[in-house]
Amino acid sequence: MRVETHSPSFTNPNPAEACSGDPTEMGSRLSGVSRAPLPHAAAGRDGEAAAAGKIGAFLRKAVAAQSYGLMFANGKLFEATGDALEKREQYGFSALKRLDGLSRRNLDAVAARLGALDSAEQALKQHIMAGAWHFRHQSNAALDDGEKATIASNHLLSRQARSSGGNTFADDKALLSNHDFVFFGVEFSGRDKNDKPLNHKHSTMDFGANAYVVSDALPACRNGYLTLTDHFFNRVPGGREAEHQDFVGRFAQMGRESGRWIHEGKYRQNAPLFCYRDMKAAVALHLIEFMRNSQDEAFKAYVFDQATQSGPALDRVLNSVFQAEFHIPRLMATTDYAKHPLRPMLLKEAVDSVNLPALSDLVSNRGDAVTAMWHAINKGKDEVVAYLLGNWQFEAKDFSHAPAGFYHELNYALSESGASVYILDQFLSRGWAAVNAPFEHVNRGDTMLDNAVKYGNREMVAALIKHGADRNLLSKWHKSDLDALLA
């Protein structure tokens, strides 16, 4: 699951051109669009404010075009389905037109399968389309300052050499290349954003202790896209996998039926995409299709009789039949949000997400600080180590044995694949690790220099040699590798 910049309000909430526009090149100037909320425009404002709002809307579309261009031009799935764009340095509004075309095609496909709707189905569709939705981003990271929430895409964080942890992996990038979007779960209840979310998981995953909630009317959402499932896995968790077992348990047949792939075409990972204009109609029609195919008469009666009368009841239905995921391009920076603690944060989570305010609350003694330091070593979190070094006093004996739950001794952890050279240097400089001490467990007898050579880490090799690493202690098969690495 799973960056927000915001645009002006529109008189027509679903303009025909919401997903498209004239091809326009913005060039490298777009790289400067980052974390400032863009101005809103509303009826009754003076001409200057309205003009600023139009500029903000244009910039949001221009940035969104880059996110969609990156996805459609680089995702292997879109190449396989014939929907890929040509790779370019910068993308015009044709990238948004591609989304618009896919969305319309996917909506037409489900509408064609259904044919004419009866009166009850029509009423259900209208009820869903008239509903107010909210989008929920869960995270352990510190994404707000109490006044403004700023959530960046994986792609933007990488470009800025920043990371607070994430859930985007190489397979996601290769198949979909959708890592320039911010991911949200969907709250369908229509309750206010200040009300605690009804859902705390997405596709069985708990993505964090805090939820940042925004309205679907937020201008930045107008350039987003919706999938009915997790976009990558594209499967609804049904039955015992579902989050709300109390609800699914009432409709056992529905629970069994809901665990499924939702796709168009022959590729089951080809999750149908829907732009902002089409997303509510898509959810309504796919729900009707599910109900027509369902054998659970009690569930169908519940939907028509109760879910149309209660927002929370409708949310239970839609978050059981689907696991909808909304995606906002690149960045969301807004003051119009609500933050909800869903559960206590774990120390490991605060370290992994580099949430220093939470870490400060969770570390109350040196024992906590030592445990946090081990987590930071394992994850290569330089900023956390710097924070701990600046706020706590440590001794070498604090790290002589790994705490419960950690699998490697200190020297191995400091030099394994992906380890931080900054953290290694800090420990060696303070005498908390012996540069030539042999490993006692994994690869017994090897030293940190063996690990650095094995993983081809020239920077780490240089740091170890600076601190007196003895190349004569290298395993025989690593000596020639060291020469090649330093050549």
Curated annotation (Swiss-Prot):
It holds the Pfam family Shigella_OspC. Residues 1-14 have a biased composition (Polar residues). The active site is at 325. ANK repeats lie at residues 368-398, 444-473. It catalyses: L-arginyl-[protein] + NAD(+) = ADP-riboxanated L-argininyl-[protein] + nicotinamide + NH4(+) + H(+). Residues 1-41 are annotated as: Disordered. One of its GO terms (molecular function) is ADP-riboxanase activity. NAD(+) binds at residues 137-139, 164, 167-168. This is Arginine ADP-riboxanase OspC3. The gene is ospC3.
